[in-house]
Structure formats: structure tokens, C-alpha cells
Amino acid sequence: MASTTPITMEDLQKALEAQSRALRAGLAAGASQSRRPRPPRQRDSSTSGDDSGRDSGGPRRRRGNRGRGQRKDWSRAPPPPEERQESRSQTPAPKPSRAPPQQPQPPRMQTGRGGSAPRPELGPPTNPFQAAVARGLRPPLHDPDTEAPTEACVTSWLWSEGEGAVFYRVDLHFTNLGTPPLDEDGRWDPALMYNPCGPEPPAHVVRAYNQPAGDVRGVWGKGERTYAEQDFRVGGTRWHRLLRMPVRGLDGDTAPLPPHTTERIETRSARHPWRIRFGAPQAFLAGLLLAAVAVGTARAGLQPRADMAAPPMPPQPPRAHGQHYGHHHHQLPFLGHDGHHGGTLRVGQHHRNASDVLPGHWLQGGWGCYNLSDWHQGTHVCHTKHMDFWCVEHDRPPPATPTSLTTAANSTTAATPATAPPPCHAGLNDSCGGFLSGCGPMRLRHGADTRCGRLICGLSTTAQYPPTRFGCAMRWGLPPWELVVLTARPEDGWTCRGVPAHPGTRCPELVSPMGRATCSPASALWLATANALSLDHAFAAFVLLVPWVLIFMVCRRACRRRGAAAALTAVVLQGYNPPAYGEEAFTYLCTAPGCATQTPVPVRLAGVRFESKIVDGGCFAPWDLEATGACICEIPTDVSCEGLGAWVPTAPCARIWNGTQRACTFWAVNAYSSGGYAQLASYFNPGGSYYKQYHPTACEVEPAFGHSDAACWGFPTDTVMSVFALASYVQHPHKTVRVKFHTETRTVWQLSVAGVSCNVTTEHPFCNTPHGQLEVQVPPDPGDLVEYIMNYTGNQQSRWGLGSPNCHGPDWASPVCQRHSPDCSRLVGATPERPRLRLVDADDPLLRTAPGPGEVWVTPVIGSQARKCGLHIRAGPYGHATVEMPEWIHAHTTSDPWHPPGPLGLKFKTVRPVALPRALAPPRNVRVTGCYQCGTPALVEGLAPGGGNCHLTVNGEDVGAFPPGKFVTAALLNTPPPYQVSCGGESDRASARVIDPAAQSFTGVVYGTHTTAVSETRQTWAEWAAAHWWQLTLGAICALLLAGLLACCAKCLYYLRGAIAPR
């Protein structure tokens, strides 16, 4: 075996230099044989592969074409002529003779800007174009020395979520070479298409453009242009791009799409893009909407406003020869068909536009006269009760024979009275005669008018009113839409809130014996279609329709909900309610016995009956918190109920003293007396051990040196004051609770329909009467109930718990799950914890809050005389987890389980058309009697006005509907007085008498020395939220939906700004 010599670094360096010389010699030999050297290959690290292990002498192929049967690499130098000839025809051709060595020439290629440039071969790129070629430009299939006419400059888009609404526009050369090859991992390499022909994008945009991504979110096509949408991440940042795709393959056919999962973005797609795409139609509609709003604002600002008080002077009418009253000629009023009501008015054969001469109060239906002449004897146009009259003012009777009126143009005979009117008198109470109709005192046109009090006589003109027509008033396309009366026929009886409708009246809804009329975008569109030649109607329809179209587009593109189109159709098409003859009427009936309402027939609630199976559950006595105390201007010698008998009530003190887990505390204020056993402060160290040596007591003795002795005023500073407090949970002798279980409950509503009795339940909510069928919306039955019959201080009250208790679950400690004694002497549940007593000064900020659970606060009160002081005691909640207290009963029960939250809905079906009247005045003499925080219904009584049903509301809460006359009902009020009652839109204030909550609430009583207070039941925010969890949940959902819609719109505008001005 030959010996081996170790290789040193110097030997390795020599070997590498020798190999480099050999490679350069091979390159020079290849150049002498007219073979072009390979251009330098610069590819991104993310798309380049490993070239190790490849045969350096064999043909080199691109990584994207590796293993795909392609022997040619068109991304590098073009092949020799023989290979080009072989590619053009399958027949072999003889090889040409070797040419003499020459310098290789770079090929010419298209730049996309009408010229050509040499392709770089060796050395690093010197400009952005050379760098793009080095990154992977593929020349066309034909001769690279010629221009490629198919190459063009196209645009792709990129944007990043991390940079906000910043869009990047990438302009690049694109050759229609078909689908680009795939990499080894099956991904499409976009770097093969990257060859910018515009400004060079930033480096991070180029990196994102060349990032491989196999997920195609959608394929977009416009004309012959095709784009692929992708989203991916680069360095933790999410990017999106729209890449231009080739449209023709190698053989001229349509190029196939990348072999990945693709989808067409539409409403039926299960995958939704993250952004909203706006195109030209949306921008065009938005611009039209802004233009419409601007035009509408300009029209509203330029529209003239009429002065109702002093109308403009009319133009002078043409003279006409008429009857002679002395030496004067009359000027007849020429009333045309285009008056304020759109009717046809005629006086003789003369016509004139009355809207130019009639004053503004014509619209109100009141009296009004307008003089067309300045003479003492002249003609007037009078108006009253929505009728126009032709009147003549005169001082003496006219001739007995009529005179024909002859105009200048032709001779016609005007319509004149058959009988001359009798003379007029100055008295206002006189009349002009039987054949005269409607004329009366003149209304002053101006303040200086001297015709005050003169009687006007004349003849009634013929008035033919056209059919009633409606229009819609727009408010930028948003609800509510108002109905505008264009023409009104009085006999149709259209009213707005009980007031007759006139031309020009605007109202959300009109009511008549024929039915109801409302307005909606559908009606405006119908009017615009029917009046296609009217610019106003077309403009109104456009302004009403465009916002809904935009909302539909936003919802469809942003939310991608399948039901958006159906919901929009329902809103647009189902909001129109044309007037028609109704065959059914709907109203409400309050749920208190005695309530009545008026459908086509009167309906009255005679009573409510409750049916169930009852099982007795026994009786028990609940725990009750009781406290007492005393304020004394000296230290007592005996701190007990017997020793403090002069200051503390004996009976409560003994009951509390004998209770379990009592708390007894004695405080001494300024204990520096000149005599007795309280001379030193050391007597009052914690626990009061020294004090107990002289005064045996069961109370805890504590010093209170920081408190003021001002309660015992009028004494020197060494005055001593003591405070004594005692509290415990006791069995109240006058409070018992009896339990009854109700199963198979059913509520029976007893109704009287036009004198016919009828009972309705949830199983049978119909009443068949001779007048028609009445369907009642009966609330569901409450189900199983638990009744708590509470007796206290001679007053009995029942509370109802919904549902059966789960005695084997969380309700095991509830009163209904205990074994009760028949005599109500057993206390249920565990013994409560000991109350905590606390001495609080009168100016302590702590008094602004409520006592905590199980706490009792005592505060000295200055007396009205010297050495007289009182004590104010405040108690908090019970402060333990047991559920047998009255607080638990009130929190888990209700006073009326079968009382629904709202009135009963009544639907009366009849074959005759119906129209429900409506109250036109506020209710009178309404009185409210009750307690608004006791959980019991209050009594509401008063007088309902005439004119129809009175939907009574008390402080905004509907308490039922009543016919005209006296009504008495019960309502659960949650607000304190004053009470505002309304009916038919008219409101008034009711008188109220509030009952003390102490007499109605089932709560414990706190006893004091001079001041007796009631333990206040305060509701915390958590308790209020627990009681209104459904409303809060619904409100939160609505708020989230609204916030999402606003955020979506904001996002649309944000990214739309970036798309309009890309970088």
C-alpha cells in the first residue's frame, strides 16, 4: 500500500486554481466554436434549487422545467441554428460548417415601448431592465434576434394589511406563452412573469410579488384579460395580489389555469374574500347619488315660500262689461281649474288660475274673502268649509232683470242669478236670502282694511272636485316617508290624525272609510313609472332607489349573506300598503278586568280565571333581621335590656336578645368623666376587659374617641356620651309563609263580544259571534307555579314562583323543598351569620353609600333639647347565602304570573269594510293610586275622550285600550310621579297618590330609640343587569351589528381611498 501524504491548505489552494484554469480554457474553446456562453443566473433564494450533484458537462435546465420532458431552456441563451431548425421541423437537417471565431453578439429583444434593446450576457446587471432579465425573462419561441410583437406592458396589483390602505401598482412585460411552469413542490412561480416595464417597486413589494403561493382565492375576468387573486404571508404580514394571467397557450388556444383549486366569487360561494370590491358601477351610482342630493338641496333652497298672512297682490284681471250698479262696471273673478285643490271652478264662461289670487288660509278650510276690485262695489271670492263662492258686495239692490255680459272678443251670455239678491244690511247677524249659500263676514286682508263687519252676499259657484291623488315626500331616501295629498275630494273622508286632509297635507299615514294609505319606495317608483314625463317624480324615484341599491351592494359584497336580496325585496316591496276596503280590523285590549275596546263591535274583558291542580306544601316562618339601640349622654351602669329600659323598647329588645347569633356593641365617646368608673382610657382597651370587671355585660365594649359628643350639646368638653346597639336574626311573630303547588295551570280569558259571552284559552283562541269571528292573541300559560301566601301584620299577600323547584339540585335549600309544619312555627334553613354593627358619624362620607350585606350602621342624632340625643339605624341586606329570606322570595317570584307584559291583540274578521276611529283629545281626570316600587299593580282610573279607542300610556308605557267614557284598570308602574298620561297623541298630567313602600313591601323593620327607619331595598347594577339580561343581550347584538356595519363601511372607504391613489 502506498503511503499517503497529508493535504495541506496550500495544496488545496493550488488544486482549486488549477481547476479554475481548466474551466476558463473550456469556456474559451467553446467561444471559438461559436457557442454562446450561458448568461449569469440570478434567482431569488426562495425559488432557486440546489445545483449540487449535477453533471457540469450535460445540458442545464431550469428548476421549474426539471422532470417535465423539456430539453430546451428558453430562459437562457438561444439554441444554435441546428437546434432551432430542429424545433421548427421534425426532419433532421445537416449541420452547417463551422464559422470562424467571432465575438458573440447580444440578441435584440422587445422592451414594450416601441423599441428594442440588447440583451446583457456577461457581468452583473447595470440597470433595472437587465436585472429583470436576469431574474427570469423568457424570450419568445421564435428568433430572439427579432422583435416580439405579442409582448405588452400590463398591470398587476398588490396590497398589504400591515400597511393599511396602500395599494402598489406593478407594471411588467408579459408575453403570451401560456401557463408558466410549476416548481418541484407543485407551486406556481410568479417570478417567471416578473419583468417590470414601469417604475421599479420597493424591495418588499418585489419580494411579495415573487413569493410562491399555491392558493388561488378567485379568478377574475374582464374582456380577454384574466386575473388570479391570491393571499399569502411574507414574514408574518398578510399580502394580497391580483396577477395578470396569460390568455393563449403555445398552440394558440386558451391557456389552462394553474392546477389548483379555483372558485368563481359570487353569492353562492362558501368562501368569501376579506375585502369589498368596488367597480365602475358602484362609483357611478355613488356619484349620481351625491349629484341628486346636491340638486335636491339646491331645489329646496331656491323654492319660494308663500306668506300665509299677507298674500301677494293678484294681477289685474281683464275688464268685462257687466251689470250696472250706478256708474261702475264689475270685474268678475276668473277661477280656473288649477286652484289650490285642483278642482274646476266656473263663474259664467270665465276661467282664471285661482292659486295666484287666493290667500294662504284657503288651505285651512276657514273663512276667507279676496277682493278683486278696489271699488266700493266689487266682487269677491269667498271660501268656507272647503268650498269657494262668488260674492257681490253692494249698497242697494240690483235691477230685477238680468243683463247679459258681452266681452270684447265675442258675445256670450254669462250665468247670472235668476232672481236678484235682496239688499244687504250692516248687521253681522243678518242673512242675504235663501238662495244665497256660504257668504258671511269678510276676513281682513290687511290691517288697514275698512270693510270690517260688512256682510257679503252672492251665489255659490259650481265646484267639481277631481279624484283624490297622493304623492310621496322624499327625505334623501331614508324612512320615514311622508304622504303628500295632491288633490282631495271631501266626500272621500281622508283624515290625518283625525284632521281632514287638504291638498298639500303631509302625513305618514292617511285613514278613511276606504282603508289606509301609506308611502314607501315602491309607491314612489310606481308614481315615477306612471308619470314618466314628470321630472319631479322621476327625480324622487331616483333619490329613493339609489340609496337602497348602494346598501344592497354593500351588504352583498361585505356581508355575503344569502338572504340579503330576499330581505331587501321584502323591505322595498312589502312596505307599500295601498288603500283598500278592509275585511278585518286589528286592535288591542288591556289585560285588566273591565277593560274594553272598539273593533267593528265592542269587546270587553269580563274577567280572568285561573285553573290548576293544588297540592299543599305546608307553612314556615322566615328569618327576619331586627335591630334596636339607644343614644345616652352618659355611661350607663347596666348595659342590658333591663338597664336600658328607659331608652330602648322592651319588647323588641327582648326578642332580639333572645334570638340566635345576636350582635351587641357598646361605644363610649370622650370617656374622660370626672367621676365614676370611666376615668381613664385604658378601661376601654380592645375587648373591654377592665370595664367588664365593674359592669358584667354580654355586649362588646369599644372606645369611640374619634367621634364627636355634639349630640349632647350644652355641656363642658368632658361630657361623656355612650351608644348602645343590638341586632340579630329572629323569627318575627307576625310573619308566616304558606306554600302551595299548582300544576296543569290554564288561564281562561272571559270576553264579552257585543253582548255575547265567550271564553278563550291557548287551545281555543277564537270566538264565533253573529257579527264575525274574533281571534285573540292569547299569551302562553305560565305552566307549573308555586304560590307563597305571606301574612304579616294582619295583611296577606301572594307571590308566585314560575316552574317547579329542583329539590335535588340547586334549590335544595329553598323554602319549597323543606318539610314545613302546619302551624307555621318552624324556621327553615341554616342559622344566619352574626350581624356586624358599626358606629358611623353624621358627616361620614360613608353614609352616601348603602350598608353592606349583614351590616347595621348606627349614627347619633342631635336632640332638640340639652342632654337629649337620638339614634338612626340603617341595615343592609341579609348577607348570607340561604334562600329562605323574604328577599329571596321577592327576587324569585312575581305578583301576577298570568298577567302578560302587554295588551291582548284582537283581530276581528268581517265581510263589511271597517275603519277604527281614533281618540282626538287627552284623557281627563286620571288618578294613579299605588306604590311604584312594591311590585304590585297600581290603580289607574279616569275618563277616556270621545272619538274612538284610547290607547292609554302612562310615562310612555302602554297600559291598554279603552272606549270613550270612564275606565278603571291596574298597571304595574316602575317610575315615580309625576305621571304623564297620553291618548291619541295628546298628553296630560295625572294626579298621583303614592303609598308608602313600608306598608306594601315584605321586608324587615329596624327599630330605633327616637327614629324608626325601614331597611331600604336598593337594587345594584348587577341585580338590574340580571333582571334585564334579555334586553341587554339584544341591545348588545344590535350594537355589534351596527358597529360591524359602520366598520365595514369605514373599511370600504379606507381601502377605496388607497385603490383610487395607488403607489
UniProtKB/Swiss-Prot annotation:
Changing residue 1048 to A: No effect on virus production from infected cell. Residues 1-131 are annotated as: Disordered. Keywords: Calcium, Capsid protein, Clathrin-mediated endocytosis of virus by host, Disulfide bond, Fusion of virus membrane with host endosomal membrane, Fusion of virus membrane with host membrane, Glycoprotein, Host cytoplasm, Host Golgi apparatus, Host membrane, Host mitochondrion, Host-virus interaction, Lipoprotein, Membrane, Metal-binding, Palmitate, Phosphoprotein, RNA-binding, T=4 icosahedral capsid protein, Transmembrane, Transmembrane helix, Viral attachment to host cell, Viral envelope protein, Viral penetration into host cytoplasm, Virion, Virus endocytosis by host, Virus entry into host cell. One of its GO terms (molecular function) is RNA binding. Changing residue 1062 to S: 90% loss of virus production from infected cell. Ca(2+) binds at residues 670-671, 718-719. Changing residue 1059 to S: 90% loss of virus production from infected cell. Gene3D superfamilies: Rubella membrane glycoprotein E1, domain 1, Rubella membrane glycoprotein E1, domain 2, Rubella membrane glycoprotein E1, domain 3, Rubella virus capsid protein. Residues 301-534, 583-1028 are extracellular. Structural polyprotein: Specific enzymatic cleavages in vivo yield mature proteins. Two signal peptidase-mediated cleavages within the polyprotein produce the structural proteins capsid, E2, and E1. The E2 signal peptide remains attached to the C-terminus of the capsid protein after cleavage by the signal peptidase. Another signal peptide at E2 C-terminus directs E1 to the ER, with a similar mechanism. Changing residue 1058 to C: 98% loss of virus production from infected cell. Residues 556-582, 1050-1063 are cytoplasmic. The record marks 300-301, 582-583 as: Cleavage. One of its GO terms (biological process) is fusion of virus membrane with host endosome membrane. Glycans are attached at residues 353, 371, 410, 429, 658, 759, 791, 1011-1012. Residues 279-300 are annotated as: Functions as E2 signal peptide. The modification Phosphoserine is found at residue 46. Residues 70-87 have a biased composition (Basic and acidic residues). Structural polyprotein: Translated from a subgenomic RNA synthesized during togaviruses replication. This is Structural polyprotein. The lineage of its organism: Viruses, Riboviria, Orthornavirae, Kitrinoviricota, Alsuviricetes.
